């Protein structure tokens, strides 16, 4: 309650009890918006991930988002990773093929308030890496087959391999036939 600038009683009057996933949006006179999101008594990393996602979805039109992990009583790497993932994945929009670009603004900066900077920084880095990988997987899965065929996928993956340290093995039609991949060839 201290962080959002309202007493527990005032929050309860708004119908907010702090239950997992529950949220209330509180506009302030200075133009900022505070979003209180419930995480329960002893939040798990999953609860914190979900809470970060709820906060970001509620803060859609705001460029700067601050998530207070300290109020949730956490300062460890796993929770920081979960909060980062929740925030970034909630902001994901398929950029896809469209005549009308997505004009919905997403946040430009994300600040996580906490203690234990070294552990939190490590968790944030891991969360960013995992979120980027998920963005790529979502983009590829959401792209219609007419716009992303096997050769396109080959180019994307071979371009990513040196940067991200993985090997790529490309099979041609004959290789696939020898491997018994008739269904894939069909």
Model-derived segments and spans:
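Short amphipathic alpha-helical segment within the helicase RecA-like ATPase core
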Residues: 1-186
């Amino acid at each position: 309650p201290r962080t959002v600038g309202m007493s527990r009683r005032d929050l309860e009057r708004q119908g907010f009890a702090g239950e997992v996933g529950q949220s209330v949006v509180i506009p302030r006179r200075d133009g900022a918006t505070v979003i209180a999101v419930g995480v329960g008594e002893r939040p798990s990393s999953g609860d914190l991930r979900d809470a970060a996602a709820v906060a970001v979805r509620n803060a859609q039109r705001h460029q700067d988002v601050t998530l207070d992990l300290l109020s949730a009583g956490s300062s460890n790497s796993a929770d920081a990773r979960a909060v980062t993932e929740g925030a970034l994945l909630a902001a994901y929009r398929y950029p896809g093929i469209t005549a009308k670009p997505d004009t919905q603004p997403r946040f430009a900066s994300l600040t996580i308030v906490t203690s234990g900077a070294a552990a939190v920084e490590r968790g944030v880095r891991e969360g960013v890496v995992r979120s980027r990988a998920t963005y790529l997987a979502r983009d590829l899965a959401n792209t219609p087959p007419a716009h992303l065929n096997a050769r396109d996928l080959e180019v994307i993956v071979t371009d990513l391999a040196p940067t991200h340290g993985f090997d790529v093995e490309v099979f041609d039609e004959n290789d696939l036939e020898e491997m018994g991949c008739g269904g894939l060839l069909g």
